[in-house]
């Protein structure tokens, strides 16, 4: 399972204050300022993890901060109908996001794909084009896992940009369709 990064919270008011929000038996602090979120962006709520002692393997660790189902080493993700009609949220590939605790990074859907791909993790995972993870505290293990995944209009090999510590790396993830050299996905819905 693949899980997402955490932040000290998710966007909210423009007051600059933080507020605790009870979720899944955990308390998460969601940042509300000064880094205001734009439309299409979300911040991972650190307390929404589903595993506080997650393992990065067999996923590929990218820039030392996040483990993703990157091709060709990981099979393409299977998809199912999301129930959200025929648009860009038509199919969903459920897979967790695994993040290294205490790190800050962004997951970004490149501009050419924003009309057909969204990403999101947490409770609930909000379909977004940019997910911010901001220094989720170490609460047991080095890696934290979050529920969520990828929404897409049609199966494809898609790019995702990871940005951390002044570095950026583009990776490719098979969402319902295999990337070159990647094993085929099970449970694909065209």
Predicted regions: what they are:
Residues 8-190:
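Non-catalytic macromolecular-recognition regions in eukaryotic signaling proteins
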Residues 3-5:
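C-terminal motif of bacterial Sec signal peptides marking the signal peptidase cleavage site
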